[in-house]
Amino acid sequence: MFSIQQPLLVFSDLDGTLLDSHSYDWQPAAPWLTRLREANVPVILCSSKTSAEMLYLQKTLGLQGLPLIAENGAVIQLAEQWQEIDGFPRIISGISHGEISLVLNTLREKEHFKFTTFDDVDDATIAEWTGLSRSQAALTQLHEASVTLIWRDSDERMAQFTARLNELGLQFMQGARFWHVLDASAGKDQAANWIIATYQQLSGKRPTTLGLGDGPNDAPLLEVMDYAVIVKGLNREGVHLHDEDPARVWRTQREGPEGWREGLDHFFSAR
């Protein structure tokens, strides 16, 4: 049992979870965002998006100043009041976007894997793929420690590609719509654990944690949460956790922000 009155952190994925996968609407979640803000409960966004995209969304959602996890955990944007922490305002895990791009270009040229990265196209194309405005699409290209791509080869070649990346110290991660390449040392779980430890160090008490996500790349995050909401999503693979004790994990019947609201209702409204 837990409540929003105790030390609590909420970690949330964006697309398909807090945001509608198609319209990017978040209004069904607005009442809970307001309630959490009024209770001084940090809502920490955690996504494959770039920090530039997420800072814009943070402001839109009324969450500015809080930490966030970008690029599937490869980037941690620190809270505004954490200026004394080394690396402020952002901590980068592993090798840079530019270095990963060089590896991918070499694999494509020498081993003929077929894929299209966000670096290969302009913001108009990304806007068409995603439904974002061109100005928002431009923010998706500001990667610091990962590469986003569309896979255009066979499943067999994907297995070979994944193995080659692993040999080179990289990982290949599936998101709700796209695939992501990042350093093997990075992850949403590691980033979340770092943020949890920082809050614990500052307050003297470990906060209870609740995570919400809808895609396979959210599983590592949800595994390290005390409580988890698996929002019904579009991805055919779904989300599968090692510990799916119903006292800890709730699978929603609704999608997107309505599922987000359903998950919060489940864990808090009856308590």
UniProtKB/Swiss-Prot annotation:
Its cofactor is Mg(2+). One of its GO terms (cellular component) is cytosol. Pfam families: Hydrolase_3. This is Mannosyl-3-phosphoglycerate phosphatase. The active site is at D13. It is an enzyme of class 3 (hydrolase). NCBIfam families: HAD-SF-IIB, HAD-SF-IIB-MPGP, MPGP_rel, PRK03669.1. GO terms for biological process: mannosylglycerate biosynthetic process. The keyword Magnesium applies. GO terms for molecular function: magnesium ion binding; mannosyl-3-phosphoglycerate phosphatase activity; phosphatase activity. Its main location: cytoplasm. Mg(2+) binds at D13, D15, D214. Keywords: Cytoplasm, Hydrolase, Magnesium, Metal-binding. It catalyses: 2-O-(alpha-D-mannosyl)-3-phosphoglycerate + H2O = (2R)-2-O-(alpha-D-mannosyl)-glycerate + phosphate. Its EC number is 3.1.3.70. It is found in: Cytoplasm. Belongs to the HAD-like hydrolase superfamily. MPGP family.
